[in-house]
Design a protein with these regions (language model features):
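N-terminal signal peptide c-region/cleavage motif recognized by signal peptidases
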Residues: 14-16
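Periplasmic c-type cytochrome electron-transfer domains
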Residues: 18-487
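Sec-dependent signal peptide recognition
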Residues: 2-7
């Protein structure tokens, strides 16, 4: 209790001159919307006014929401699903454009609900040349020989799916300094491939679908501003050593900054969307032209596809004009305004957030650059609370092997990103996550059932800040959560 009182006193003294920005309720500047209901994440940017642009947004929404069918479907513009896939519609992973959720405990290998999450796979026993290509940003990873780079747990009629998967949980309690306890859960994954055996050196990574809001604004944060926040060797000795991921641009054929995905493995929203079309739904695009069938998956390789033809200007299952609309839609999904930004409880919580060091990774504010393609998103002052960098989040949040055992944290798994590293996720909208989808969970694998659990899973570079939270008195914990829930 003495420690908690000392911390409380220190916070009062150090934050007495804390200044509140009177525009921060507009989390996404002029693009912010006032929505705070179940569809709060589905509105377009508030300043998107041109009828042509709104129609394009609505067109992208249609392709984002509507299910794709197995070839040959009744709607030729939306067939080609699979042969292997995780889901048949973008919206089914990104529920109402929000985040997904972890599966509840499964009683058998059939699993329960894996509709909004997936497992990525990469080998750790690779050649020197392959590792150099990853660390140079020229190659994402080396895929597992049995299930490839992503486990697809569903398949079209007549096709054998790749694997069965299930999850169970182990529970443990964490105590605050005042004696209050909270229960955390650790996922135990049960994965069994059907065609063959998953490689012994394969690293698996569970990924829940993230929220779609504000992505176009994140794309317009100046690259140098992100790079300037790097401190790879922790030269200032503050315990924080963020680094940018360097990834391959399929369009430009060059290495560039990674911005999107749990490990910042994609450079642009267009490439991110095309990657999801292929990996999650088995749909080819001009960027990713080959079906995700491995050599031994004979049924998959022989299956009919939904590719168009050159005469109709779309030789792939997702035409360029469709990818254009989905990308435009993804760029303009708006961030809701904050609801209580200037109340005493929330501003106190914001002071605590800064004092305990959360802002060292969750950088509050940026001004976006100018874009001719996206004028509404240009020159906006935004408050996403992310540095867009990779950070070591500790052993507990490190990726795992096929037996659900944590692997060595320094194994590269996605370009420069290691098994223990995750991009700092933007916090805007987090307080409405369970309004949009009551089942929504938190962190990359959804193990956290609420925001406080997510905070208490922080380790690695965030261990010190997490320990400060454990020392906070009850009232200050409530204030901290009030701030986070207002974002």
């Amino acid at each position: 209790m003495k420690t908690a009182i000392l911390l409380f006193t220190a916070l009062l003294l150090s934050t007495s001159n804390f200044a509140i920005d009177n525009t921060q309720h507009l989390s996404a500047g002029e693009t912010s919307v006032k929505e705070k209901h179940a569809s709060a994440f589905s509105a377009h940017s508030a300043n998107l006014k041109e009828v042509k642009s709104i129609l394009k947004f609505n067109g992208g929404n249609k392709f984002f929401e509507d299910p794709w069918a197995q070839s040959v479907g009744s709607v030729s513009s939306q067939d080609g699903l699979g042969p292997l896939f995780n889901n048949n519609a973008c919206q089914d992973c990104h529920v109402r454009d929000g985040r997904g959720h972890a599966s509840e405990a499964s009683v058998d290998q059939r699993g329960t609900d894996f509709s909004t999450m997936l497992l990525r796979a990469s080998k750790s026993n690779i050649t020197t040349a392959e590792k150099e290509a990853m660390l140079n940003g020229e190659q994402a990873n080396v895929a597992d020989s049995c299930i490839g780079g992503q486990l697809q747990h569903q398949a079209n009629f007549g096709i054998t799916k790749e694997a069965t998967q299930a999850v169970s949980y182990q529970y443990h309690k964490v105590s605050f300094a005042d004696g209050e306890k909270i229960t955390l859960r650790t996922p135990i994954w049960h994965v069994k491939a059907i065609h063959c055996d998953i490689d012994d050196d394969t690293v698996l990574s569970a990924r829940v679908a993230p929220a779609m809001i504000g992505l176009g604004l994140l794309a317009l944060i100046d690259e140098q501003q992100i790079i300037n926040q790097e401190d790879i060797n922790d030269e200032n000795s503050d315990g924080i050593s963020g680094k940018a991921n360097k990834v391959w641009s399929v369009k430009t054929k060059q290495v560039t900054l990674g911005r999107f995905g749990w490990k910042a493995g994609q450079p642009t929203l267009r490439q991110q969307s095309a990657g999801a079309f292929l990996g999650d739904m088995g749909l080819t695009t001009a960027l990713f032209q080959q079906e995700n069938c491995l050599t031994q998956q004979i049924e998959c390789k022989k299956a009919a596809n939904g590719n168009g033809d050159m005469a109709n200007d779309y030789p792939y299952e997702v035409a360029d004009k469709v990818l254009d609309k989905v990308t435009f839609y993804s760029n303009h999904l708006a961030v809701p305004e904050r609801r209580n930004a200037y109340t005493k409880q929330v501003t106190n919580g914001q002071k605590i957030f800064n004092e305990i060091g959360c802002q060292q990774c969750h950088s509050a504010s940026y001004t976006t650059t100018t874009s001719k393609a996206f004028p509404e998103l240009s020159k906006q002052t935004i408050y996403p609370y992310t540095d867009m960098l990779l950070h070591d989040m500790g052993e507990a949040l490190t990726d795992f092997d096929k037996n659900s055992q944590t692997v060595s944290g320094d194994i590269p798994v996605e370009f420069l990103a290691q098994a223990n590293e995750w991009r700092t996720p933007p916090l805007w909208g987090i307080g409405l996550a369970q309004t949009v989808d009551p089942q929504a969970t938190f962190l990359h694998d959804g193990r956290a059932r609420n925001i406080l659990e997510a905070v208490l899973w922080h380790g690695g570079e965030a261990e010190l800040s997490k320990n400060k939270v454990l020392q906070l008195p009850k009232r200050q914990r409530i204030e901290l959560l009030a701030f986070l829930e207002d974002l």
